[in-house]
Every structure is written in structure tokens, then in C-alpha cells.
Amino acid sequence: MMKFKTLGNRNDPAILFFHAMGVTGESGEPVAKYLQDRYFCILPTSTVYCKGQKYVSKADEIRQVEEYLKSQGVEYLELVVASSIGADLAMAFLTSTKLPIGHVFFDGGQFAQIGKGTRRIMTPFLYLAIKSLYWSKGDICSK
């Protein structure tokens, strides 16, 4: 199960945050704390980052978000905010939800449609880049 953290009053307009890869829903807290006096901020954490949980599918994550929103009485989202790979999940949410949404803000979404042949060519290079980052203990990023 996904974990959900909320800030603000449930009766205020709702903002739903989708976090980036490598962080939890709490990464949106600095912004949510600023907005909590006027908005009900919902910060889900993907099951990938929930201890003892197993990621099933994007559809399952969306189902969990929908169920949580319903349990909180959310009938309208003023804003959906998503960063990096979270934008991918947010886009899937947006295309399947029946909830009305006022605004959407994506920061660094990954929406490129890369063909199978190109992926096959690029995979070894990506693997090497990840290994290089591991071997350098992250020092490669500071150069």
C-alpha cells in the first residue's frame, strides 16, 4: 500500500503531489507547508519506496490514489503537481480519473517515446553510466 501524508484542512481545495524517483512523497513538504493554510495538500509515496511493500503496477498505484482521494472526500483537485518520473504516473492518473482538475504542473516529465531499436542501442550506455556513478560513489556528478 502507498503511504499518504496530508497537510492542511480537508475542506479546502485539494492539491495532489506526485514525487520524483529516489525520494518519497515527503519531498513535496516544503511547498505543501507553504500552501497548507489555503489548500489540502496530499503527498502520496509510491509503494516502491514503502518499506515491506511491493510495487505491482502503475494501474495499481493509480487505483490506490483514487481510493484515497475518495476516502478523504476529495471531489475536485485544484492542482496536480508532478516531478520527473512522477509526471509519468500523474499523466496516467490524469488520463484515467473522473475527477475534475483545475491545473496541472509538470516539472521535468519524461514523455519521450523511444523506439525499441533505439532502446536496445542505448541500454548498454545507460548501464555503463549507472555503473560509473556507482564506482565513483557519486563523485562523477560533482564534475
What role is predicted for each listed range?
Residues 130-143:
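Helix-loop "lid/cap" segments that line or gate small-molecule binding pockets
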Residues 5-51:
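Conserved HGGG/HGGXW glycine-rich cap/lid loop of the alpha/beta-hydrolase fold
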Residues 21, 40, 63, 105-119, ...:
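Membrane-interface segments of envelope glycosyltransferases acting on lipid-linked substrates or membrane lipids
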Residues 42-81:
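Active-site loop/oxyanion-hole signature of alpha/beta-hydrolase fold enzymes
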Residues 95, 101-132:
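Flexible "cap/lid" loop of the alpha/beta hydrolase fold
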Residues 81-90:
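Gly/Ala-rich beta-loop-alpha elbow adjacent to hydrolase catalytic centers
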